[in-house]
């Protein structure tokens, strides 16, 4: 384990919406340091959402998607006397956001649409409407925690 807790670096809000969560999303979306490509994909997806939705704002859909995918509970492995138990634990807010972003990007990449902009736009729309693969991942995580509620007293 490390001696000191690593300092949390502040991210700058993005230039268009002034939103730190969008900056974190772009940073997670980025491959090989190509931030301009990731930025184009993100803003392109938000514009595509506005085209599809009509009167809805892309940023509102994005915020709804993040909120809907944030997990409340997850399971952590804990060894007790030779047996490994899946112990349900509450998820800290910072980790909730990080997992939501990670799941949205992962499942957007697995979609079958033609471009990444379309994939991301459709995954965000699905997540905002409480469907899609990333929302299912959150539900599965919660079900796993509920199923192992009996081991909750092993929390640390």
From Swiss-Prot:
InterPro entries: Ribosomal_uS7 (IPR000235), Ribosomal_uS7_bac/org-type (IPR005717), Ribosomal_uS7_CS (IPR020606), Ribosomal_uS7_dom (IPR023798), Ribosomal_uS7_dom_sf (IPR036823). Keywords: Ribonucleoprotein, Ribosomal protein, RNA-binding, rRNA-binding, tRNA-binding. The keyword Amino-acid biosynthesis does not apply. GO terms for biological process: translation. GO terms for molecular function: rRNA binding; structural constituent of ribosome; tRNA binding. The keyword Aminoacyl-tRNA synthetase does not apply. It comes from the Bacteria. CDD domains: uS7_Bacteria. It holds the Pfam family Ribosomal_S7. One of its GO terms (cellular component) is small ribosomal subunit. Signal peptide: none annotated. Belongs to the universal ribosomal protein uS7 family. One of the primary rRNA binding proteins, it binds directly to 16S rRNA where it nucleates assembly of the head domain of the 30S subunit. Is located at the subunit interface close to the decoding center, probably blocks exit of the E-site tRNA. HAMAP family: Ribosomal_uS7_B. Part of the 30S ribosomal subunit. Contacts proteins S9 and S11. PANTHER family: RIBOSOMAL PROTEIN S7. This is Small ribosomal subunit protein uS7. It comes from Campylobacter curvus (strain 525.92).
